A protein has these predicted regions:
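Acidic, low-complexity/disordered tracts enriched in E/D and polar residues
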Residues: 1-29, 34, 67-72
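Long, charge-rich, low-complexity alpha-helical segments
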Residues: 26-72
Length: 72
């Protein structure tokens, strides 16, 4: 399990989306990024589909994931 509390691009609000991690300032779950990428979408398509999310946030989430996996 990744420690999302160390990623500045995301937040967890207990009363929002059952406490799921979301992109900061949005209601878009972080998991939506990975589900869309797994389904064949590109980052550009994801950003088009979820305009409240910025490229910087996506880059930060992907960087955090990569760092977390290489540290494990």
């Amino acid at each position: 399990m990744l420690d999302w509390s160390r990623c500045d691009a995301v937040e967890r609000v207990p009363d929002r989306l059952s406490g799921a991690w979301t992109f900061k300032g949005t209601r878009v779950p972080v998991m939506a990024l990975f589900q869309n990428l797994e389904g064949g979408a590109t980052v550009d398509l994801f950003l088009e589909w979820f305009p409240g999310v910025t490229r910087q946030q996506v880059d930060a989430v992907l960087d955090h994931t990569t760092r977390s996996l290489t540290e494990a």
